[in-house]
């Protein structure tokens, strides 16, 4: 009885080819693609092209009746000098910006709203950004002549009223931490991207947060902050800076495909030359 082992051997051969190709992709081509694109990204966009400034590094003035104001001075850094990054340590720090450069501001606001009444959970949060210290908390309409409002918007938020409470079912469902329940039910998240422009010639920037209804208290989450991004003339660089993670996925995929094509062409060329060499050696023999 003859046993045909050609099929299992052929299957084993092709399986080994697939495993080798997968290992080359995983251990050589993919890391090489990541390194090449990372170097390409840093050449186009230096590490100091953006800076995340937490709101807890601003000077803060609170007023339940009149809102909360965050203001900080700007320090212009000349070209050729390293641009420092803001340290998230809760201490007031000047905002470093490259001299003669326009910036775009991305706001990431996370906050709780407490109501002193037992009704009206829904409210509007008024957001104003000023060039300068901005208005006094007691007189929102009376700003300094040097101040310039460069952005305004209103966003709906949910406020925690006096009669609101957490049920045992909610606590059991979301975990033993009551703060997790508050995060799930009452944490308001507002993101505003690519709508605010700021020049490094400004001396001060201030962000003014106020609810339409007076009897509210805002509690700012420590993750809140403002991302300062350099505004380049090339739209592609701005997009890469805004969507860094997405640009890495696309860029690495492109370089991965290019390297795979080069590997394939090189492998086919080497295979053809080897076959020709074998054929010539057979003819001579």
Swiss-Prot record:
Topological relation to the membrane, as annotated: Multi-pass membrane protein
Residue stretches spanning the membrane: 17-37, 245-265
Residue intervals on the Cytoplasmic side: 1-16, 266-285
Cellular compartment(s): Endoplasmic reticulum membrane
CDD domains: Seipin_Sei1_like
A molecular function (GO) term: identical protein binding
Alphabetic keyword roster: Endoplasmic reticulum, Lipid metabolism, Membrane, Transmembrane, Transmembrane helix
Disruption phenotype: Produces supersized LDs that are up to 50 times the volume of those in wild-type cells.
Parts of the chain on the Lumenal side: 38-244
Induction of expression: By calcium shortage.
One GO term of the biological process aspect: phospholipid homeostasis
GO CC list: cortical endoplasmic reticulum; endoplasmic reticulum; endoplasmic reticulum membrane; lipid droplet
Miscellaneous: Present with 846 molecules/cell in log phase SD medium.
Entry function: Involved in lipid metabolism and lipid droplet (LD) morphology, number, and size. Facilitates initiation of LD formation, and ensures that vectorial budding of LDs from the ER is directed towards the cytoplasm.
Family according to the record: Belongs to the seipin family.
Protein name as it appears in the record: Seipin
Source organism per UniProt: Saccharomyces cerevisiae (strain ATCC 204508 / S288c) (Baker's yeast)
Gene coding for it: SEI1
């Amino acid at each position: 009885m003859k046993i045909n082992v050609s099929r299992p051997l052929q299957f084993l051969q092709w399986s080994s080819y697939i495993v080798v190709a997968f290992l080359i992709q995983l251990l050589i081509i993919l890391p090489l693609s990541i390194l090449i694109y990372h170097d390409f990204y840093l050449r186009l966009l230096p590490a100091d092209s953006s800076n995340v400034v937490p709101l807890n590094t601003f000077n803060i003035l609170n007023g339940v009746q009149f809102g909360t104001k965050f203001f900080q001075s700007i320090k212009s850094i000349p070209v050729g000098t390293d641009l420092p990054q803001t340290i998230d340590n809760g201490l007031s720090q000047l905002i470093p910006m490259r001299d003669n450069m326009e910036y775009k501001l991305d706001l990431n606001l996370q906050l709780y709203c407490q109501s002193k009444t037992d009704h009206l959970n829904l409210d509007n949060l008024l957001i104003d950004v000023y060039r300068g210290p901005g208005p006094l908390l007691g007189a929102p309409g009376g700003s300094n002549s040097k101040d310039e409002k460069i952005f305004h918007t209103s966003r709906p938020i949910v406020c925690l009223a006096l009669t609101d409470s957490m049920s045992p079912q909610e606590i059991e469902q979301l975990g033993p931490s009551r703060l997790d329940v508050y995060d799930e039910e009452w944490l308001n998240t507002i993101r505003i991207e690519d709508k605010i422009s700021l020049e490094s010639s400004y001396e001060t920037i201030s962000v003014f947060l106020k609810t339409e209804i007076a009897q509210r208290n805002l509690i700012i989450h420590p993750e809140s902050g403002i991302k300062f991004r350099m505004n380049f003339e090339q739209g592609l660089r701005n997009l890469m800076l805004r969507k860094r993670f997405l640009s890495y996925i696309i860029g690495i995929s492109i370089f991965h495909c290019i390297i795979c094509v080069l590997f394939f062409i090189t492998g086919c060329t080497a295979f053809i030359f080897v076959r020709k060499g074998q054929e010539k050696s057979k003819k001579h023999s």
